[in-house]
Amino acid sequence: MLIYKKKNFGRRSVYNLKKCLHKGFQINSCNIKAADNVLHSKASAFEKVNVVDKESIGNLQHHLDTVLPKKKFQFLRDPKTNDYKWDEYLSKILPVDKFNFGLLSKFRPPSEDEQLQKVANSIGAEFVGSTSSLTGLMSQLHFFISKWKFPNFSDLSKGFYISPNERNFTRLCRSASSVHISYQNGLYCIDKDKSLTKEPSVNIILMNVGKSLETFFTVDKDQFLLYKKPPSSNGVLKPLKDVFQYGRCSSLLVRSQLDCYDKKIPESGVFDLKTRAVFGVRMNQTQPELFKSYKLTHYYGNRISFEREYFDLIRSAFMKYSLQARLGYMQGVFVAYHNTSDIFGFQYIPLVAMDRAIHGSSEIGEAEFNLNLQLLEKILQYATSIFPKRSFRVMLSTTEDVPNPPLKVYLEVADDKENRGFDLLDGQKNLEAKTVSPSNFCALEVCALQFVNGVHKSVVKHLDEKETWSIKYHFRKPRDQDNLLRNYIRLRDDIKRRESKISNPPESLLHDYYACSEQYYKRN
């Protein structure tokens, strides 16, 4: 029996409700009662598996912990007085060719992490993943659940200009996401889809700078000398420990690496450490010699300012940062801004600030995270029922230009060692070549309706801490599998092009930005 109040639904909503809901589903003003295809935000969706010794987690060195309580951007060197607020030692970045990356522990994807798999077997988990392999999928689920809600820029100054085409998340952030699931001894291990990444990556410089700076900020001066090539000290190297937090959502086990701990941070005291290349570097990766020309000199404004960097973080990085923080039970992120040569300043961004920008409030952010993770686990379970005990790829994609779009789930059987290539020069050739066998492919759609305390909502814009947000969903297999297969190949081709593309903004724009920065430093 279906019970609803007419005043709560428009004609289209009633039609969709009758079309999508299964029999036996009951709605009233207080609760939702149904079978397994209803998710609740109040459910204990994500739980800690292990207890972490916080003393083993790294700490910020060089008095950088003084940044944490302020929550606002702090210049390393005051642009007006030229006085250093912290040790001048922090201002220069060691060139990547002088840093011994061989001393750092190597990243292990879930399919190669024996300890992660051991933990999974001990608790009876079926799926294992890491924050880096899951956040892309969870970003697509955010867009699906939120109905493509735009980010909130209320923390920016009133004078900051936002053009109409910059009010949404970046194109890369919005693009479809793909992972490879490796079936090993009863476990499904979720790795990044390496077949879509061109090697070497165009971001290799920024990645290496980030790795060296994470060490730079968490060891003292004497220890850091030992990471140089050749070592500048005869001391004994104290290797940095890898500390992991494991969390579980039903049959899904997630690994999160913990970077930093400080008792001044409320609750867990754990936070993430991020390094952020400034606008001029991100937009001009083909000319490393110009990296040092772009400097941050202002707090506010659209150019050469901290505010510009914060604006770009909201559009491109906060989604990933906030998901990683929640998956690792972290309270925020410490961000260092640089141009690969100089460090300009630091900021601690708490999770509540990222929630405000992405979701509008922490209540919505926390509730959506629980729903997001539950839905992801259900999708994985459904996918393995189609291709049981097989290795395969999963791609999630949702469209922003149609009302109430379904979530598309593309599944493709792919062996662990398979690394199918695409001709980047000819997308039509990829379509005609039938690079994916129809017998090893399946496309699904996820349809969903949302409710707050049993009342249907097209979009959840506000949520009280005491309210329950629920999602009623179901899977369907569209008939036009051939067209969906072609669409899947197009999406893969598009992702690979974007991954391989080097940013080349108009030369006049870069010249304008660089000129502003250089003129400021000449005057001062």
Curated annotation (Swiss-Prot):
Q: Which GO terms describe its biological process?
A: mitochondrial RNA 5'-end processing; mitochondrial RNA catabolic process
Please provide, in alphabetical order, the Gene Ontology terms of the cellular component aspect for this entry.
mitochondrial envelope; mitochondrial matrix; mitochondrion
Q: Where is the transit peptide?
A: 1-12
* Lineage top rank: taxon: Eukaryota
Indicate where this protein resides in the cell: Mitochondrion
* Keyword Transit peptide appears in the UniProt entry: yes
- Any Pfam family from its record, for instance, is Pet127
Q: Which UniProt keywords apply?
A: Mitochondrion, Transit peptide
Q: Name the family.
A: Belongs to the PET127 family.
Protein purpose: Required for the degradation of mRNA in mitochondria.
Q: Which protein, by its recorded name, is this?
A: mRNA degradation protein pet127, mitochondrial
